[in-house]
Amino acid sequence: MEYLIEFSEEFEKSMKKLKKKDKTLFLQIQKKLLELINNPEHYKPLSNVLAGFRRIHFGSFVLIFKIEGNTIKIISLDHHDNSY
């Protein structure tokens, strides 16, 4: 199945800041997004309040996304302490 990706405004703002502050992490996230398109079910599903969402860790940062049909909705990218 081919997936489309939608980015939330919050995620786009986070990436814009990250591009200026940490180019290496920015590039890691871009690479992982390309992998995500091919196999979004591979990543860990969340539970409780965040049931229905999945996560990808990048060091101390967490990317949270949701799969809806053939669309992957990227919700947020934030420090682990602020994500949950």
Could you tell me what each predicted segment is?
Residues 13, 31, 41, 45, ...:
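Residue-level signal for pocket-adjacent positions within structured domains
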Residues 2-5, 9-10, 16, 20-26, ...:
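Enriched for short, Lys/Arg-rich terminal
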Residues 31-56:
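A short, surface-exposed loop/turn module that caps and links secondary-structure elements
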